């Protein structure tokens, strides 16, 4: 139940002409200190209409406001503060969670709508680095959140399996590669060749030309070029699949850039039909001068297509195939101009569905204050970080709970969860300084802290068996009330995370719930035999439901024992 809405409805009966219910709801605040109640309405906006001081208006409103749902109404300066009936609210909230279980928090505003989410999208023949973690986990979380809000979600891994870099890689392999060596450790060896190409090209400009020539051969279907490309792609997808399994990430499809090669000429034909193509120094472009942007390059002077051509083609294909209402591109901020050009070209074609398309950028993972770069080899491999995190979790379990069943599985959940939560706990546009030490801490604002809180709550429930269906829940103490208020916010938290494309809204929320529950655990004798025992256990159960579901929305597992 939305209790602020109830407050707004009560106030709207007083302000029948002055403010709409929505205007009232937008003005209602949550006091930072408990002594000022559970909700507050500021009267500043009414001073001009009433020709009275806000404090006087607040007193008059407080006298008129009568509702059994409020145990106390008071005017404090220019604010009308209300205290909700704790027994009524706690009973309603707990019964809702107990009935809905993991469905609690489900929203319906995405019902009968489709969202396409383009995320992860690593490049073939390059290691899966920590730098890929952000797009992968932000996109994965947004997928879960959108599904929770009723959307039909299509999760696409737009693999970087095409482009001039493959001409460079083929050139490097032909010059310095050894088939037997590459077969021993394909991704690492191919990456070494990629880095070597960029080191050598500074002294040998002809290498760049050779790279372009090999990519042209690849586009034209040259047998040797295609065979090498297929090999690079096959080996890369094997590595990616292993890492996605560790992270618990799944996709609807893996349609990479190469998938659209045979569709691009049709799209270029559409641009020609709309008279949007211009020739510029032998290349084909869409002029975006009126929009204040550089021209969007569609085809190079040598006839090769580029990233923008494939993205435009892919967008039309996805709209025709999935009929999306929204399309999110979870890609770094360095691509902002590309997406502005890309969306603008679609608008110039008259496609109204482009209004539902959005670039979802994020900050970088930094190493020593610098962005990681695959070209220069400044790279930390994600798989190595995950393996180390899992090993550390295993050591921790051996020390604290050596008799734990399924230790390896729990260590995987905790280790991977630590890495994922570290990535998602801050607002997505913030840069993250890579620190294995901070990422793997098992206290403070970390994934393992939330997981441990969930496991602690589960351990309490294993000690008692209660039939909640016949109970009426009457919790009034401050510690219980703080948790109930937090649990009641979960549906709105999910809605906010979806609207803002911001998983950190949920990360911060589950940390708040965990911290509030741990205070409760430290101050309340939960299993004492008295009239409120069943209510306390219902509260503990509700906490496990919300923590587990909140972590799931982030892509983090919630073990019941740790």
Swiss-Prot record:
Keywords: Aminoacyl-tRNA synthetase, ATP-binding, Cytoplasm, Ligase, Nucleotide-binding, Protein biosynthesis. GO terms for molecular function: arginine-tRNA ligase activity; ATP binding. HAMAP family: Arg_tRNA_synth. This is Arginine--tRNA ligase 1. GO terms for biological process: arginyl-tRNA aminoacylation. It catalyses: tRNA(Arg) + L-arginine + ATP = L-arginyl-tRNA(Arg) + AMP + diphosphate. The keyword Aminoacyl-tRNA synthetase applies. GO terms for cellular component: cytoplasm. It comes from the Bacteria. Monomer. SUPFAM superfamilies: Anticodon-binding domain of a subclass of class I aminoacyl-tRNA synthetases (SSF47323), Arginyl-tRNA synthetase (ArgRS), N-terminal 'additional' domain (SSF55190), Nucleotidylyl transferase (SSF52374). It comes from Bacillus thuringiensis subsp. konkukian (strain 97-27). Belongs to the class-I aminoacyl-tRNA synthetase family. It is found in: Cytoplasm. A motif ('HIGH' region) lies at residues 122-132. The lineage of its organism: Bacteria, Bacillati, Bacillota, Bacilli, Bacillales. CDD domains: Anticodon_Ia_Arg (cd07956), ArgRS_core (cd00671). Its EC number is 6.1.1.19. InterPro entries: Arg-tRNA-ligase, Arg-tRNA-synth_N, Arg-tRNA-synth_N_sf, ArgRS_core, DALR_anticod-bd, Rossmann-like_a/b/a_fold, tRNAsynth_Ia_anticodon-bd.
């Amino acid at each position: 139940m939305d209790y602020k809405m109830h407050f707004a409805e009560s106030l709207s009966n007083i302000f029948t002409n002055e403010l709409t219910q929505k205007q009232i709801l937008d003005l209602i605040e949550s006091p930072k200190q408990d002594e000022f109640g559970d909700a507050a309405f500021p009267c500043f906006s009414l001073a001009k209409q009433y020709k009275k001081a806000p404090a006087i208006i607040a007193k008059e409103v407080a006298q008129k406001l009568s509702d059994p749902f409020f145990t106390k109404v008071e005017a404090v300066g220019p604010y009308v503060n209300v205290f909700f009936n704790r027994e009524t609210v706690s009973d309603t909230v707990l019964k809702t969670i107990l009935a809905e279980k993991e469905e609690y928090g489900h929203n319906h505003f995405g019902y009968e709508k489709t969202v396409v989410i383009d995320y992860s999208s690593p490049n073939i023949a390059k290691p899966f680095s920590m730098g890929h973690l952000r797009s992968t986990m932000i996109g994965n979380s947004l997928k879960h959140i959108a599904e929770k809000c009723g959307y039909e979600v299509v999760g696409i891994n737009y693999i970087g399996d095409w482009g001039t870099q493959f001409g460079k890689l083929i050139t490097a392999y032909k010059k310095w590669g050894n088939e037997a060596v590459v077969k021993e450790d394909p991704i690492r060896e191919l990456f070494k060749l990629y880095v070597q190409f960029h080191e050598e090209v500074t002294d040998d400009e002809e290498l760049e030309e050779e790279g372009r020539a090999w990519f042209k051969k690849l586009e034209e279907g040259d047998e040797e070029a295609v065979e090498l490309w297929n090999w690079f792609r096959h080996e890369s997808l094997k590595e990616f699949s292993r890492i996605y399994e560790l992270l618990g990430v799944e996709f609807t499809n893996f349609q990479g850039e190469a998938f659209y090669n045979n569709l691009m000429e049709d799209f270029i034909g559409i641009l020609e039909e709309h008279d949007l193509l211009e020739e510029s120094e032998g290349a084909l472009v869409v002029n975006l001068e009126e929009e204040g942007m550089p021209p969007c390059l569609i085809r190079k002077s040598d006839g090769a297509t580029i990233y923008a051509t494939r993205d435009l083609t892919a967008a039309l294909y996805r709209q025709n195939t999935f009929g999306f209402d929204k399309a999110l591109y979870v890609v770094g901020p360095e691509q902002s101009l590309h997406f502005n050009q890309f969306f603008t070209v679609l608008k110039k074609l008259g496609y109204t569905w482009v209004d539902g398309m959005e670039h979802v950028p994020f900050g970088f993972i930094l190493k020593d204050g610098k962005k990681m770069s695959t070209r220069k080899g400044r790279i930390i491999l994600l798989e190595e970080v995950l393996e180390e995190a899992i090993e550390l979790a295993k050591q921790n379990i051996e020390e604290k709970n050596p008799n734990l069943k399924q230790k390896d599985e729990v260590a995987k959940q905790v280790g991977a969860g630590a890495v994922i939560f570290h990535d998602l706990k801050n607002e997505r546009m913030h840069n993250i300084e890579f620190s294995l030490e901070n990422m793997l801490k098992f206290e403070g604002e970390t994934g393992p802290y939330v997981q441990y809180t969930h496991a602690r709550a589960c351990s309490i429930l294993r000690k008692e068996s209660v039939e909640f269906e016949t109970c009426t829940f009457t919790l009034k103490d401050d510690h219980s009330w703080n948790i109930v208020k937090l649990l009641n916010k979960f549906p709105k938290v999910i809605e906010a995370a979806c609207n803002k494309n911001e998983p950190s809204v949920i990360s911060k929320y589950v940390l708040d719930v965990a911290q509030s529950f741990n205070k409760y655990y430290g101050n309340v004798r939960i299993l004492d035999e008295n009239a409120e025992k069943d209510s306390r256990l219902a509260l503990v159960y509700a906490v496990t439901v919300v923590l587990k579901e909140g972590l799931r929305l982030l892509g983090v597992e919630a073990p019941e024992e740790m």
